[in-house]
């Protein structure tokens, strides 16, 4: 019995360091621009992160949000970032990331609008509006206009009524 307690302790410590090591490796790959490799590391280590503590899970969710943003999966990124509001682990990084996220969403919506993908543009502009409803009311107007251009009048009316 005396041998099992230290063995269990060392396994737990090794497990914790393994989680942090994989997360740091994925963060470094993301920072160097290798988004696919960072995503692959997170997917392959998903079972390892299931039992992680709250700090590691918050950092993992933040990185997953950044990866989703760079893959232009804005809905997923938004839900990841929203789940982190009020979390002390990433509270210093989140406002800056949300500003960059808002700019990326709006730029993507503008590109969609120029390409004639008005429905996609409308949904992205509505997402940008939802980031800060007080200061981004103009995005709701543009989302409604894009919905009109996409001939989705019910959605446009919904957006106009929300104004």
Set out the residue ranges of the language-model regions.
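Solenoidal tandem-repeat scaffolds enriched in leucines and small polar residues
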Residues: 132-133, 138-163
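Repetitive helical segments and hydrophobic/amphipathic motifs
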Residues: 11-12
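Conserved structural position within tetratricopeptide repeats
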Residues: 47, 86, 129-130, 162
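N-terminal leader/linker segments that initiate helical-solenoid repeat arrays
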Residues: 2, 6, 16-103, 107, ...
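Alpha-helical positions within canonical tetratricopeptide repeat
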Residues: 37, 76, 120-121, 155
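A broadly conserved amphipathic alpha-helix scaffold signal in soluble, globular proteins
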Residues: 82, 110, 123-126, 161
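Intrinsically disordered, low-complexity, charge-biased linker/tail regions
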Residues: 110-116, 120-123, 130
């Amino acid at each position: 019995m005396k041998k099992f307690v230290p063995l269990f302790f060392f396994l737990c410590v090794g497990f914790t360091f393994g989680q942090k090591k994989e997360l740091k490796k994925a963060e470094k790959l993301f920072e160097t621009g290798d988004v696919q490799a960072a995503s692959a590391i997170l997917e392959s280590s998903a079972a390892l992160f299931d039992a992680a503590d709250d700090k590691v899970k918050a950092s993992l969710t933040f990185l997953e949000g950044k990866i989703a943003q760079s893959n232009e999966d804005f809905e997923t990124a938004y839900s990841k970032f929203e789940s982190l509001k009020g979390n002390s682990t990433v509270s210093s990084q989140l406002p800056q990331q949300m500003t960059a996220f808002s700019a990326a969403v709006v730029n993507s919506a503008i590109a969609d609008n120029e390409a004639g993908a008005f429905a996609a543009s409308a949904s992205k502009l509505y997402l940008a509006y939802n980031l800060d409803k007080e200061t981004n009311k103009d995005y709701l107007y543009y989302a409604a206009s894009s919905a009109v251009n996409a001939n989705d009048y019910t959605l446009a009316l919904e957006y106009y009524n929300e104004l």
